């Protein structure tokens, strides 16, 4: 049974401009330590960050909170399985809310084109 659905879109150029203004501080606000390692290795840091931003916003919307009520960007970690499928791991307040909602499955899709990155998150329980 679907208990949460969230979608977000991020303009890559806008994220690149924020990076140019604020540098690593902007990335640190959005990314976990493990994601920061990947960010530093990325040749397209603005695109990388826009995709993570959209995914985390989509996840927070699926939980029903947005980035508020104690839920922060650091409560969400994006990684990939061996085949490249995106995975979403929850921690902190986001994990607490997911437990209360009895979330058993999290589905994440991330896509990007020239100007935009977008993500959709579906939360399921049995």
From Swiss-Prot:
**Cofactor(s) needed by this chain:** Mg(2+)
Among the GO biological process terms of this entry, one is: lysine biosynthetic process via aminoadipic acid
Keywords of the record, alphabetical order, are: Cytoplasm, Fatty acid biosynthesis, Fatty acid metabolism, Lipid biosynthesis, Lipid metabolism, Magnesium, Metal-binding, Transferase
Q: According to the lineage, what is the superkingdom?
A: Bacteria
Instruction: Return the Pfam families for the record.
Output: ACPS (PF01648)
Is Magnesium found in the keyword set? yes
Main localization, broad class = cytoplasm
This enzyme catalyses: apo-[ACP] + CoA = holo-[ACP] + adenosine 3',5'-bisphosphate + H(+)
The Enzyme Commission number assigned here is 2.7.8.7
Positions bound to Mg(2+): 8, 57
Which terms in the Gene Ontology molecular function aspect does this entry carry? Answer: holo-[acyl-carrier-protein] synthase activity; magnesium ion binding
List GO terms (cellular component aspect).
cytosol
Show the PANTHER family listed in the entry.
L-AMINOADIPATE-SEMIALDEHYDE DEHYDROGENASE-PHOSPHOPANTETHEINYL TRANSFERASE, PHOSPHOPANTETHEINE TRANSFERASE
Report the protein name in the record. Holo-[acyl-carrier-protein] synthase
Give the taxonomic lineage as stored in the record: Bacteria, Pseudomonadati, Pseudomonadota, Gammaproteobacteria, Vibrionales
